Amino acid sequence: PVELREAIRELMTKPAFWWMTAGATVAAFCGYGISSFQSIFLVRAHEITTGEAAIWINAPVSMSSAIGTFATGWLATKLYKKHPGAIAWVPALGLALSIPFYVFAFTTQNLLYAALGLIIGGFVKYGYIAAQYTIGQGVVSMRVRATATAVLLFIANLIGYGCGPLFIG
């Protein structure tokens, strides 16, 4: 087993790891904030019940987000052969593309359009999840991969879960 000090020392020499962690943390901050605020917003703005929000909006959004994670990972892997940077820029493009869909979803007066904005936004946004693990483990030695993942998740979840819902809600 690798000592924590040795693992942290290696991580400190990997700027790509820290840039990716920063990006994943910002994405988690927004994602956790949106997901915790989304149901309350739908209930208040569109006068639906929490059950209706959960079944008719949040379930399809969750499904599209999961599919988007796999689709983005697949696309980035496919493009990686010719464009090694695709593992980073494909998910980054998805994050950027999600912004207008989320803005639209939270500003439209039409519930169907709001649902579509959230579904499409979730599909393109959550592709970063596949990339964060690929990059996080790809820039360190095999002996440090588990620690790298733990550090990434600790930082992203501490700030994402800890501050995202509070700030956005």
What are these model-derived regions, one by one?
Residues 1-6:
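Flexible cytoplasmic inter-helical loops of multi-pass small-molecule transporters
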Residues 9, 18-27, 60, 101, ...:
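Alpha-helical transmembrane segments of MFS and MFS-like solute carriers/permeases
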Residues 13-21, 111-115, 143-146:
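Primarily residues marking transmembrane-helix entry/exit sites
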Residues 14-70, 124-133, 161-168:
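Extracytoplasmic gate region of multi-pass secondary transporters
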Residues 50-54, 142-152:
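Loop-to-transmembrane helix entry/capping segments in MFS-fold secondary transporters
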Residues 68-84:
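Helix-to-loop junctions at the C-terminal end of transmembrane segments
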Residues 80-81, 136-145:
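Paired intracellular helix-loop junctions of major facilitator superfamily
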Residues 84-132:
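C-terminal transmembrane helical hairpin of 12-TM major facilitator-type secondary transporters
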